Amino acid sequence: MKFGVVARRDKLEALKLAYRVYDFLKVSGFDVVVDEDTYRYLGEFSEDDVLPLEEFDVDIIVVIGGDGTILRVEHKTKKEIPILGINMGTLGFLTEVEPHETFFALSRVIEGDYHIDERIKLRTFLDGENRVPDALNEVAVLTGIPGKIIHLKYYIDGGLADEVRADGLIISTPTGSTGYAMSAGGPFVDPRLDVVVIAPLAPIALSSRPMVVPSSSRIDVRNVAMTREVILSVDGQFYTYLSPETEITIVRSPRKTKFVRFNREIYPKYTMKIKSRF
């Protein structure tokens, strides 16, 4: 078994724990690689074991950080590599264990005492081309001018679903339903469901409400106000300005995100984290 280790770059405790994980796995006889950014912020790792995330070819990536660190790993890795998330963030919806459980969790992984949790992702096409990363959480179409609304139409499988004047439109996976989409009034969606949430962001019309559609749906978003640019955000990690006439299409990605899990229960973990957030 070969491991990758990635740490949150702005937290010394995460970097130090990453080195302890690295050392533990090396001493246990496993091949271990570390991503370049982790090494850049803590140079104690062997330089021979340092690789860009894009070149990781391992069995499991141990990510020490929060959801943002996991999303960064997801966007940069080329393969569907299972992730073991150790929470060094705020809430850590995507992480599996707390720091004090790290080495017990690693021992269970080594013994094969775990299962893989697969999550759907969204793929975005801009004028028919896939030029942006797949989204684990959400794709957001946002106003390009703060304080100015945008006028959008969105279609489900070719049929007009709604026309909204709002700050934006969020298209979310079940995984992302506890994030930006929930802040926009969207529902909590059990991550085991195969659906997509569409949530207008601060719409003018009270009739513009969140929708839940099958993940097999094709979602087309069109900018009605052709004089106003929009911003496309993917998981809050990738941003790009789009010209007003850009045709945006969102579908379920053929790729999935895989997580190492030790417990098959969703509740009460998710609901407790949602409540602690507010």
Curated annotation (Swiss-Prot):
Q: Which Pfam families match?
A: NAD_kinase, NAD_kinase_C
Documented EC number(s) = 2.7.1.23
**This protein's UniProt keywords:** ATP-binding, Cytoplasm, Kinase, NAD, NADP, Nucleotide-binding, Transferase
Which cofactors go with this protein? a divalent metal cation
Q: Which InterPro entries match?
A: ATP-NAD_kinase_N, ATP-NAD_kinase_PpnK-typ_C, NAD/diacylglycerol_kinase_sf, NADK
Query: According to the UniProt record, what class of enzyme is this?
Result: transferase
User: Where does it reside?
Assistant: Cytoplasm
Which reaction equation describes what this protein catalyses? NAD(+) + ATP = ADP + NADP(+) + H(+)
Task: Show the GO MF annotations.
Answer: ATP binding; metal ion binding; NAD+ kinase activity
Q: Domain of life of the organism in this record? A: Archaea
Per the Swiss-Prot or TrEMBL record, the active site comprises: 67 (proton acceptor)
Question: Where primarily located?
Answer: cytoplasm
An example Gene Ontology cellular component term from the record? cytoplasm
GO biological process assignments: NAD metabolic process; NADP biosynthetic process
Which positions in this protein are listed as binding NAD(+)?
67-68, 72, 137-138, 148, 165, 167, 178-183, 202, 237
Give the transmembrane region(s). Answer: none
Functional note: Involved in the regulation of the intracellular balance of NAD and NADP, and is a key enzyme in the biosynthesis of NADP. Catalyzes specifically the phosphorylation on 2'-hydroxyl of the adenosine moiety of NAD to yield NADP.
Entry's family note: Belongs to the NAD kinase family.
Protein name per Swiss-Prot or TrEMBL: NAD kinase
Could you tell me which species this protein originates from?
Answer: Thermococcus kodakarensis (strain ATCC BAA-918 / JCM 12380 / KOD1)
